[in-house]
């Protein structure tokens, strides 16, 4: 209803506007007619003069001038023709001006194209471009200032042609009622039909229902399941995991901050104030007396303890160097101003190396037996940019005896890396390089003594009675034999840490790493342990040598005392005798020297990496040592050493012996090669004849069914000796013992003792029957020629036949069709009397099984099949002796 009211109001407003402009349009038309040189005469009523009616005026907002293309391009004039909507029942024509160049011919319709207008005047030929009729431009509206608003509802369709216009006889004006109806019809046409099939799916639900469903779905998705209540165990695990995470993060932070610090277990860097609160006394290790710690002042534990330390070639003390370091570190935020304090428990050794490995300087302090020498000293650049190279080569020595501190020479010095940002000013002489790789002899035996049993590590282990496995992986021990200073090599001075005399250790303090006992031998133990055994005529001894030892190379520097030292014997077997004779002579002279020096205690450096700990510890106090070689006397020599070194000689002399007996064949292979009746397609070796196993199985069926119902046969059978049958009864004398016992037990053939005795007398107790022709017949013995020659029926007893009905019942159990069973019967039946002999029945059973295996029946049974049944029925089974 609301839409209809709005349409009516719009139509009335348009009608009133058009009526008011009627007078103005008339005046304009009259002026144009006077000024225009193209004036059309009044039209004469004729049927041929059918013109297209003038289009009604459109509203001003929607009206616009339309440019048209005409043949006369020079005279392009834009004109507007408008006519007011005539009143009802008025048939008079309205004069309008026309031009030959352009003409407005736009028609707008809301319903259809059937309502057209008719003009009383003829219209000139005007070619309009249909593609431009619907386009309105602002420029055209400015040029056509004379155009007035056209009535939208009175315009016809723009797509209608001129031919349709001339067909209408008269002009049919639009009334306001018609316009209102048109608007209503157009609005109703645009409405969606009230058809359930054309509705959308959402139209079936009201907006409230849709919103409700949406809210419920969102609420269900937003609801999260309530977390389960954690038990006490879960809470405890969570707490432990959090603690572990915090510890791990703290460790990572500490490792990042001090990644270059290697501390032995039990060392703490703390400030003086923290130590005073703990209330325990700190000790500094005294090298002169390794068993007693020396107490020191807490105030001397910081950098102040270096006040009395002076270099030999400089007047500057280490205190000034330390202050300079602290000042520079404060500027660079590298080291900080915190003073370091070292506490040394009694059970741990001191080996601290706080260095920055990223710099070019590597400072390494070597602690020898006196504790007052450093292989690589502390080199530092003074304030003027000069470096004390003498400190780098010879180390820092304590010469100031007037200080209040204790003697530094008796204490372990802690070298601290002095950071210097100016790397270019550091001398290249302090730069270190790696030791060259070991020789071929060392690589051959796979020894790595430079890593595990270096001079520094052995020295520290001996000082503190610790084995290598007690040191943590975070400890950083700079090995002197693993680094060589360039300055020392240039000066030609031997490295202090590489000589054997500088690395001697007391026996009593040495604790060796634990390895397997010497009794547990291994196939390559000779190469690993570096053990060389000699078979001497006078005495037996074992020499423990280190294949990586430097004693052989430095034998000349040790006064020629180590010239007898050799590596592990790698010569050929032919040169062993000569080497042993030379070694015996050398050992005899050396033993005399050792007896003179028994009272003297000689320190040694045990460098054997894989030497047995238990054997050396037990024999250490009994044997003698010299120049890094451990010699065990005959009393302390292991008992198994001589036995093992004799075993290879015996094995070489003993010839190779082969087994006298042949090995048994593989039973599993034999089992596979046998024929499997359930899988006959896997082996075809036994398919052409009967095997012993099959024949025994078929004979069992034969024995169980032979002679049944044969006495009921009324037809005379071929080859049967009826002389053994008397009065319809079968004599038991010609029947096997087993059959005889079966007949007697069933009382089928009763017999008396007299008949048996008479039969035995007539046959002399032999059971041999004499035929009528004088030939001897024995049912127990079958001639192979007769068994194989089936063309001629042999003489058989009635009890040795099996009836055809019984054979059919036995063979029918196989499930084969009767046609197949008939073919098998025809292949084996030679007597043609409805019975089968033993051989015929066995071959028939074999053919039945072959059919069950899937083989085709042959046209004729091969002779090899009949030959496989030959023999006297005696089988000899040979069992293998175990």
Swiss-Prot record:
Keyword presence, Lipid metabolism: yes
Compositionally biased intervals (Acidic residues): 575-610
Biased composition (Low complexity): 69-85, 130-142, 634-657
Domain EH, residue spans: 783-872
Annotated transmembrane regions: none
PROSITE patterns the record matches: EF_HAND_2, EH
SUPFAM superfamilies according to UniProt: EF-hand
Gene Ontology CC entries for this record: cytoplasm; plasma membrane
EF-hand domain span: 816-851
Stretches for region Disordered: 15-36, 69-148, 217-238, 378-409, 424-448, 567-674, 748-769
Keyword terms, alphabetized: Lipid metabolism
Statement: the UniProt record of this protein carries the keyword Lipid metabolism: yes
Gene Ontology biological process terms in this record: endocytosis; lipid metabolic process
InterPro entries (UniProt xref): EF-hand-dom_pair (IPR011992), EF_hand_dom (IPR002048), EH_dom (IPR000261)
Molecular functions per Gene Ontology: calcium ion binding
Polar residues bias (residue ranges): 26-36, 99-114, 384-393, 616-627
Coiled-coil segments on the chain, per record: none
Annotated Gene3D superfamilies: EF-hand (1.10.238.10)
Superkingdom of source: Eukaryota
Chain's role: Positive regulator of phosphatidylinositol 4,5-bisphosphate turnover and negatively regulates signaling through the cell integrity pathway. Involved in rDNA silencing.
Similarity annotation: Belongs to the IRS4 family.
Protein name: Increased rDNA silencing protein 4
Origin species: Lodderomyces elongisporus (strain ATCC 11503 / CBS 2605 / JCM 1781 / NBRC 1676 / NRRL YB-4239)
Name of the encoding gene: IRS4
């Amino acid at each position: 209803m609301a839409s209809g009211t709005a349409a009516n109001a719009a139509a009335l407003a348009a009608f009133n506007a058009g009526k008011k402009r009627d007078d103005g349009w008339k005046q304009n038309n009259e002026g144009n007619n006077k000024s225009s040189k193209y004036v059309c005469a009044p039209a004469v009523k004729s049927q041929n003069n059918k013109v297209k009616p003038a289009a009604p005026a459109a509203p001003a907002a929607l009206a616009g001038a339309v440019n048209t293309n005409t043949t006369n391009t020079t005279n392009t004039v834009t004109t507007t023709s408008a006519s007011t909507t005539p009143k009802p029942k008025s048939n008079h024509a309205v004069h309008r001006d026309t031009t030959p160049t352009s003409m407005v011919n736009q028609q707008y319709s809301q319903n259809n194209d059937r309502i057209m207008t008719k003009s009383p005047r003829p219209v000139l030929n005007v070619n309009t471009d249909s593609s431009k009729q619907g386009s309105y431009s602002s420029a055209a509206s400015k040029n056509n200032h004379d155009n007035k608003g056209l009535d939208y509802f009175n315009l016809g369709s723009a797509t209608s042609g001129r031919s349709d216009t001339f067909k209408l006889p008269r002009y049919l004006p639009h009334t306001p009622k018609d316009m209102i109806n048109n608007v209503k019809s157009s609005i109703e046409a645009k409405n969606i039909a009230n058809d359930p099939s054309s509705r959308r799916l959402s139209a079936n639900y009201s907006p409230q229902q849709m919103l409700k469903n949406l809210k419920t779905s969102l609420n269900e998705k937003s609801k999260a399941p309530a977390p389960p209540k954690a038990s006490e165990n879960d809470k405890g695990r969570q707490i432990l995991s959090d603690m572990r995470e915090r510890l791990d993060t703290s460790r990572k932070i500490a490792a990042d901050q001090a990644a270059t610090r290697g501390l032995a277990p039990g060392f703490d860097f703390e400030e003086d104030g923290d130590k005073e609160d703990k209330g325990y006394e700190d000790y500094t290790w005294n090298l002169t007396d390794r068993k007693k710690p020396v107490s020191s002042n807490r105030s001397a534990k910081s950098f102040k303890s270096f006040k009395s330390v002076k270099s030999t070639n400089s007047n500057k003390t280490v205190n000034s160097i330390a202050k300079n370091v602290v000042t520079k570190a404060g500027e660079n935020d590298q080291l900080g101003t915190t003073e370091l304090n070292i506490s040394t428990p009694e059970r741990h050794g001191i080996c601290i190396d706080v260095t920055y490995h990223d710099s070019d300087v590597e400072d390494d302090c070597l602690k020898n037996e006196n504790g007052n020498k450093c292989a690589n000293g502390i080199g530092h650049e003074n304030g003027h940019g000069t470096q004390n190279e003498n400190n780098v080569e010879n180390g820092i020595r304590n010469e100031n005896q007037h200080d209040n501190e204790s003697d530094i020479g008796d204490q372990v010095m802690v070298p601290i890396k002095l950071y210097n940002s100016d790397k270019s000013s550091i001398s290249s002489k302090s730069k270190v390089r790696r030791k060259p790789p070991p020789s071929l002899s060392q690589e051959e035996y796979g020894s790595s003594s430079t890593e595990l049993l270096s001079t520094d590590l052995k020295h520290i282990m001996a000082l503190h009675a610790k084995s290598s496995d007690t040191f943590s992986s975070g400890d950083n021990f700079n090995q002197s034999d693993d680094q060589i200073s360039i300055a020392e090599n240039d000066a030609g001075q031997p490295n202090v840490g590489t000589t054997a005399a500088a690395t001697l250790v007391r026996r009593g303090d040495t604790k060796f790493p634990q390895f397997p006992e010497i009794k547990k031998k291994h196939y390559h133990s000779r190469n690993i342990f570096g053990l060389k055994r000699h078979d001497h005529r006078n005495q037996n001894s074992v020499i423990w040598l280190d294949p990586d030892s430097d004693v052989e190379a430095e034998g000349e520097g040790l006064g020629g005392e180590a010239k007898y030292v050799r590596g592990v014997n790698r010569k050929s077997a032919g040169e062993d005798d000569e080497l042993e004779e030379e070694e015996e002579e050398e050992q005899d002279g050396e033993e005399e020297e050792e007896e003179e020096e028994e009272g003297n205690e000689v320190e040694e450096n045990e460098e054997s990496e894989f030497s047995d700990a238990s054997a050396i510890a037990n024999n250490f106090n009994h044997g003698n040592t010299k120049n890094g070689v451990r010699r065990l006397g005959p009393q302390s020599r292991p008992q198994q050493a001589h036995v093992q070194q004799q075993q290879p000689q015996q094995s070489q002399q003993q010839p190779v012996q082969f087994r006298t007996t042949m090995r048994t064949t593989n039973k599993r292979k034999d089992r596979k090669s046998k024929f499997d009746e359930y899988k006959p397609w896997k082996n075809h070796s036994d398919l052409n004849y009967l095997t012993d196993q099959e024949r025994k199985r078929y004979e069992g069926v034969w024995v169980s069914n032979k002679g049944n119902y044969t006495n009921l046969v009324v037809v005379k059978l071929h080859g049967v000796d009826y002389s053994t049958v008397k009065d319809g009864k079968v004599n038991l004398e010609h029947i096997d013992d087993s059959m005889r016992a079966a007949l007697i037990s069933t009382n089928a053939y009763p017999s008396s003792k007299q008949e048996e005795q008479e039969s035995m007398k007539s046959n002399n107790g032999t059971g041999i029957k004499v035929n009528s022709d004088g030939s001897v017949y024995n049912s127990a013995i079958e001639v192979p020629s007769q068994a194989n020659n089936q063309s001629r029926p042999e003489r058989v007893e009635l009890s040795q036949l099996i009836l055809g009905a019984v054979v059919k019942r036995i063979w029918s159990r196989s499930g084969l069709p009767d046609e197949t069973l008939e073919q098998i019967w025809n292949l084996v039946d030679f007597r043609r009397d409805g019975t089968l002999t033993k051989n015929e029945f066995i071959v028939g059973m074999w053919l039945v099984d072959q059919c069950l295996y899937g083989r085709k029946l042959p046209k004729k049974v091969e002779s090899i099949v009949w030959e496989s049944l030959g023999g006297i029925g005696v089988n000899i089974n040979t069992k293998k002796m175990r």
